[in-house]
Amino acid sequence: ARTTLVVDETMVDLWFDAPPPPPLASFCPNGNVITLGSAGKSFWGGLRLGWVRAPARTIAALAQTRDTLDLGSPLLEQLATLWLIENGDTFLPARREMLRERRDRCAALLREHFPEWRFQMPEGGLSYWVELPDMLAPQLATRAEAAGIHLGTGTRFGLSGSFDRYLRMPFSLETAELESALMRIKPLWLALNKGGQAFKRPFV
């Protein structure tokens, strides 16, 4: 009962197939629940602002702590974010549709050019969680980094190598940029996977 629950809802506005369930905090109105949101995820990546919803005493403590760390966020960006939150229903549907199209295009490219990789279609968000055979994901990420392409490896998202097989593959780029990046990754993958390693289980 004394545990503080921190809920990351930074992607909650970016659903494609079905609306998300109500906020977790709504099921525990008197509990100590901290919910995190992000204008950069919901609206535009260049808007480096987020928000926190929590009990008043928690917000007061966080605000006091923040005063010792920085001078605050730019007022103009805060006002822009407030307007976006209040008017999100007018343009979030178009953003979701754009991301849905990019998700689908990325899936088609992955299936065509990287048949050894496995993934599931995300129901929302900005990226795929891709599984590579034979623990090759960290090596591919290193080679891609040298070529100027940053891929997030699963290593940073788990302990003891539990996600070393995975890459986080964003699909939020414009289609031409996405295709260009994947075509640059393809020869790196082919050189790395000379033995043609693949999963024995069916591709999803």
Indicate residue ranges for each PLM-predicted region.
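Active-site pre-lysine segment of PLP-dependent enzymes
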Residues: 1-5, 9-42
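Active-site PLP attachment segment
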Residues: 26-61, 73-76
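Structural signature of PLP-dependent enzymes
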Residues: 62-69, 85-107
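Conserved glycine-rich beta-strand-loop-beta hairpin in the small C-terminal domain of fold type I
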Residues: 82, 99-107, 117-131
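Short, conserved charged micro-motifs
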Residues: 135-142, 176-180
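PLP-dependent enzyme catalytic core of the Aspartate aminotransferase-like
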Residues: 146-147, 159-204
